[in-house]
């Protein structure tokens, strides 16, 4: 089988997705890999079968399919690499020059295999073995991460705190507004007075910590620390996988679960802060054309980078900003309904706002701020618009 049947094109079709997933496994959920993996496999399968129908020669069809896959899946990476070499290559290698050159190279190699290669079957065994070898490392990285995550989660299932029996159990909301500035910082740095909103909260019985400071400067460090009542150094969470386990199944969550609370969570667009295994995980309605951030990253490594950069993609395709708007608006709409849910709730709501990219105007309309060359003043105004909206 290894010597006669060229199955390597199908394994090569899987490699780009698995390799990218392994490289980013600390930032993504494994379920984000399934759709692009299936599509990549189908691309390889369809091209392979089509070549066999045309050529009536499995070994030759396999080699031509491999050339096509290499062209299709590496174009975006080659494009980025060439543009990063020097200012000269930045202007030289544009899509209008690189795409034809890359296409001619691929077509030339295909022609050589079709017309000139005498014994295509001689390549089958070596390429079959190499394709298997190619998948070993990414599959090992991905599976190891899954096992480590399971182990870390299991170790955190038991909280050191115990609920007080018989006590009243009100709903508890832990709402995080990512990158929301303190009043004095907003006033002194951005010249925005947020005191009317804070005073309104005080009138409703809220406590405002006027001189509060974040425990850490990054979400991956800050939230796990907060959800476990201690600093990460004390908790022994130096590794990324340990911090994620502390975030998703930490002491606070375990405490409420042990006391009979239902855990409620929402999608954030970032796997690290998504509690998809919550008792009630309230997702939003995804546009059928929407790509996840992992899928977008993957697509940009392929030849599909060209229509993306040329902005010729169907206008119905949801952008990253559009999806962020949908997530935020869905969370705000659904969190209002939770008081009607029976039982005691612990609600974990991480809203990536006013954190950029800036998706909202002050009244909630889509924000118009998109330019990369914006001035500091324009950036400040866009940030304040997010604050005004979320208030």
Please tell me what each predicted stretch does.
Residues 27-28, 317-318, 367-377:
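Membrane-interface amphipathic/re-entrant loop segments adjacent to transmembrane helices
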Residues 150-168, 326, 332-336, 370-391:
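A long, amphipathic alpha-helix that forms part
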Residues 36, 162-166, 187, 242, ...:
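Short, charged/polar micro-motifs that form catalytic or ligand-binding hotspots
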Residues 55-121, 169-174, 179-369:
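Active-site-proximal alpha/beta segments of enzymes that process anionic O-linked groups
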Residues 2-150:
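Transmembrane and membrane-interface helices of multi-pass
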Residues 118-129, 145-169, 189-192, 196-197, ...:
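Cytosolic-biased juxtamembrane loops and peripheral soluble domains of multi-pass membrane proteins
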Residues 2, 164-167, 256:
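Structural motif
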